[in-house]
Amino acid sequence: MKMELLIKAFIMGIVEGLTEFLPISSTGHLIIVGSFIKFTGKFATMFEIVIQLGAILAVVYYFKDKILSSLKALKPGEWGFNLWYKTFIAFLPAAIIGILTHHYIEEHLFSPFTVAIALIVGAIMMIVIEDIFGKKYKIDNMDKVSTSKAFWIGVAQVMSLFPGMSRSASTIMGGMLVGLSVRAAAEFSFFLAIPTMLAATGFELVKNITSMSLLEWEALAVGFIMSFITALIVVDKFLAYLKRHVLKPFAYYRLLVGVLMLFLIAQKIVK
């Protein structure tokens, strides 16, 4: 029993790290894989949110030089202050809506069917937005994002509260809509992930910390470690990929996964 849970945690940690920062929905993939390996239930739902902490720390480590430099320039008007202020402004919309709708989303929207629909809808949006705005960008550096543009990227992030939309996809699309290059949008998306995912992870830990067993803590540790290692590799490779390539392959992949999920649901393989 113990080894079985730890193996499942190992697998789910890798899935989280692979998918969290790609615009393909980590939630969708965790639901699919969780259904196949029979990792479901209350602990599984909490586990999938908390192991995001490993992915967050991977981003912190990847941007450590920029983060440390920004923390040395926190006087009003300095670039570090401006960066974190804009990140906070972008964080607020999803934070407020998330607090107000958390219970409803958790009880009614965390299902394979809703995730499949979100994967497909998000894929279509990615294709359309890239076709229209992909080469019309005016901002190629996240440091040049204005406060108003940061706010609208934050508004776009609200879409990611719907399971399957993908936080990464929502914020990258939002960035492109307000004039960022896909790479600049991705970098801002990763920075924005730090407060957003820390808040979500902290909220779940506070709710469940007193009711977890030692074995569940061990499973969380395994998932956390694998999520960190895998996400660190993915962030580096994804940003390098965006220097020369576009998002459409990820959109087509989302379409494929969404249709596959609908088929598996119809066959009652995934419930």
Curated annotation (Swiss-Prot):
One of its GO terms (molecular function) is undecaprenyl-diphosphatase activity. It is an enzyme of class 3 (hydrolase). It is a multi-pass membrane protein. It is found in: Cell membrane. GO terms for biological process: cell wall organization; peptidoglycan biosynthetic process; regulation of cell shape; response to antibiotic. Pfam families: BacA. InterPro entries: UppP. Keywords: Antibiotic resistance, Cell membrane, Cell shape, Cell wall biogenesis/degradation, Hydrolase, Membrane, Peptidoglycan synthesis, Transmembrane, Transmembrane helix. One of its GO terms (cellular component) is plasma membrane. It comes from the Bacteria. Its EC number is 3.6.1.27. It catalyses: di-trans,octa-cis-undecaprenyl diphosphate + H2O = di-trans,octa-cis-undecaprenyl phosphate + phosphate + H(+). The chain crosses the membrane at residues 5-25, 43-63, 80-100, 109-129, 145-165, 186-206, 215-235, 246-266. The keyword Hydrolase applies. Coiled coil: none annotated. The keyword Transmembrane helix applies. Bacitracin is thought to be involved in the inhibition of peptidoglycan synthesis by sequestering undecaprenyl diphosphate, thereby reducing the pool of lipid carrier available. Catalyzes the dephosphorylation of undecaprenyl diphosphate (UPP). Confers resistance to bacitracin. Belongs to the UppP family. This is Undecaprenyl-diphosphatase. The lineage of its organism: Bacteria, Bacillati, Bacillota, Clostridia, Thermoanaerobacterales.
